[in-house]
Amino acid sequence: MKNILVCTIIRNQINNLDRWWHQLHELVAHCPEYNFTFSIFENDSTDGTKEWLVKNLSNQENVVFSSVDIGTRQYGSVWSVDRIKNLAHYRQKCLNQVNINIFNKVAYIEPDIEYDAKWCSELINARHPAQLGIVPDIYSAWALRSLNNPKESAFLYDTCATRQTKDDLVWNFESESKWRRETVQPTDLGGADSNCLHTLYSTFNCFCVYNSEAFKTKSSQSEVKWGYTNKGLNTNQTSFRDHDNNISWLDADTAVICEDFREKGYNKIYINTNCLVRHL
């Protein structure tokens, strides 16, 4: 059996927690070759999330969770320097509270998404890459926008971290069709489950699986940690104000982690356009 760590950071998600936990149980059922451990970091919730976690997860043997009040500001899905720093800190907390050395894979799964566990189990089982003799270092879903905005619901949600090339700062919708044609990998698991594997520069998309080796300390190199940086961004060509009107740019932590993986030699990054998740 292989071991996978599933990480989730949570704040004020009471309306989504039952769905989130139920989907994770379904995911376990579709990944029989893996032992699952769940690492959860919650902070500053005021809507009953803390109480739900204590009631439902306290006695679970395969769950590790922290619940703290640190007084940070809560943001929505916006690009903010402060938010990026906080998210990187929270995601790293999920790794710090376990022994990472016992895991083969690490998955980050957001609490406010909906997905078909049978289809998305591919991200853990990685059968499409296996057809090509590939063990992916990063393998993600394709996240769609909320149905609350029907006109936008067919578009990619994670435009910050999903990038076709190193030079992109966000998702390039204009070249998406070309990207789909040129990056598709020839795999076929039958019927519609084919020609859905693509290469790209970086990704997250609310459900992302990582090679755990990158997070482990080795004698030859230090481990990858969640962080933030201006690395790779030419700010002389970009006038950018964040959500709080600050003139600055910190690249998304979910894009930075991909670049850090690449620098350590973990450069097999894929996305599966059949593994659809819906942001709620």
Question: Which role fits each region the language model picked out?
Answer:
Residues 2-8, 24, 36-40:
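Hydrophobic targeting segments
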Residues 13-29:
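Short, well-formed alpha-helical segments that are part of the catalytic scaffolds
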Residues 13-17, 83-91, 249-254:
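Phosphate/oxyanion-binding active-site loops and adjacent basic polyanion-contact surfaces
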Residues 14, 41-51, 70-72:
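A conserved acidic beta->alpha catalytic loop
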Residues 52, 56-103:
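Active-site-proximal specificity loops/subdomain of glycosyltransferases
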Residues 101-114:
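Short beta-strand-to-loop acidic/aromatic patch adjacent to the donor-nucleotide binding site
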Residues 113-230:
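Conserved catalytic core of nucleotide-sugar-dependent glycosyltransferases
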Residues 189-280:
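C-terminal catalytic/acceptor-binding lobe
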